[in-house]
């Protein structure tokens, strides 16, 4: 990730999000936005939970207090699943390509390629 020209590792964000018990998994990408890049965090929550403004704020506060303001996502979006390779690694590039309307290569290497559909044409990412 490179918002405002500052290099940020996604692992720094994931380490903070792991502290939020409501979140099962997350994936962060850089979305091209307004001649820059903004951080977008997708979260898979525990069953039966919905992403509220309070939970979004809790996630942002944990990230901000343990990293830098640049690490704080501009958007947090709930998804039902996060795509992974057959070996279990989350696939940030595939999600980034879906968000940007670009083709995703090598979907045969994904354990759950159907999860990619959750990242296409999200209204939350159009403003």
What are these regions (language model features)?
Residues 16, 32-33:
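Positions that flank functional sites
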């Amino acid at each position: 990730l490179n918002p405002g020209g500052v290099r940020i590792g996604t692992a720094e964000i994931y380490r903070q999000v792991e502290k939020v018990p409501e979140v099962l998994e997350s994936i962060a990408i850089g979305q091209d936005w307004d001649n820059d890049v903004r951080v977008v965090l997708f979260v898979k929550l525990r069953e039966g939970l919905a992403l509220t403004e309070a939970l979004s704020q809790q996630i942002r506060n944990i990230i901000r207090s343990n990293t830098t303001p640049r690490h704080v996502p501009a958007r947090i979006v709930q998804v039902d699943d996060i795509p992974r390779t057959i070996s279990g690694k989350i696939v940030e590039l595939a999600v980034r390509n879906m968000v940007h309307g670009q083709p995703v290569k090598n979907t045969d290497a994904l354990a759950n390629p159907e999860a990619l559909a959750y990242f296409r044409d999200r209204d939350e990412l159009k403003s």
